[in-house]
């Protein structure tokens, strides 16, 4: 399995193209949410409107921690600044929708003194404003790695989301 993964990575990295208006990219990311205190996985799609401006749609799922799981879907815009050969930084601005699901066991003490456990479930969804920044390093003309930090501003549930990922440009 490891040999197959290395072969696929080598094949992908050997392809070449340049980033310009109309280009697209697909990627995956590992994320961490400060409010949920959990890690998650995400997928993203990018479209280059110009050589410097790209839009990004992403979906992240944060694994359950202490009875809470979360997912978000985002639409962000990046303005790419060339800092050095193959290295770019960018601000992040956009909108998102976040959804939290929670499951907790609650111990109920009845009037007669008996105890019973009841499961308490629920979910909440809210719109978010995303603000942050990131950095990207091109491993090849098509493959890049990135690190990003964004603040999800959500009514009563602001969260810092940190992510690292890889993207393939085509």
Summary of predicted features, one role per range:
Residues 22-35, 54-64, 144-154:
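Transmembrane beta-strand segments that form the barrel wall of outer-membrane beta-barrel proteins
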Residues 26-30, 43, 55-57, 75, ...:
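Membrane-embedded beta-strand positions of outer-membrane beta-barrel proteins
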Residues 21, 36-38, 50, 84, ...:
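A cross-taxa feature marking solvent-exposed loop/turn segments within ectodomains of secreted
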Residues 1-23:
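Cleavable N-terminal export/targeting peptides
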Residues 20-37, 98-125, 163:
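Outer-membrane pore/translocation modules
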Residues 46-112, 122, 126, 137-141, ...:
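Gram-negative (and chloroplast) outer-membrane scaffold detector with strong preference
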Residues 22-24, 37-41, 69-73, 87, ...:
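Residues that define the transmembrane beta-barrel architecture of outer-membrane proteins
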Residues 115, 125-170:
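A generic hydrophobic-segment detector
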């Amino acid at each position: 399995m490891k040999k197959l993964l290395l072969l696929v990575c080598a094949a992908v990295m050997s392809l070449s193209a340049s980033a310009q208006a109309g280009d697209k990219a697909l990627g995956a990311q590992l994320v961490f949410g400060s409010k949920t205190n959990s890690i998650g996985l995400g997928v993203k799609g990018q479209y280059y409107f110009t050589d410097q401006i790209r839009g990004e749609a992403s979906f992240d799922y944060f694994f359950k921690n202490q009875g809470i799981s979360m997912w978000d879907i985002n639409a962000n815009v990046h303005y790419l600044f060339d800092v050095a050969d193959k290295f770019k930084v960018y601000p992040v601005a956009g909108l998102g929708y976040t959804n939290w699901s929670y499951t907790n066991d609650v111990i109920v003490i009845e009037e007669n003194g008996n105890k019973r456990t009841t499961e308490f479930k629920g979910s909440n969804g809210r719109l978010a404003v995303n603000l942050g920044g990131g950095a990207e390093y091109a491993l090849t003309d098509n493959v890049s790695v990135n690190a990003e930090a964004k603040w999800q501003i959500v009514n009563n549930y602001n969260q810092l989301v940190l992510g690292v990922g890889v993207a393939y440009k085509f």
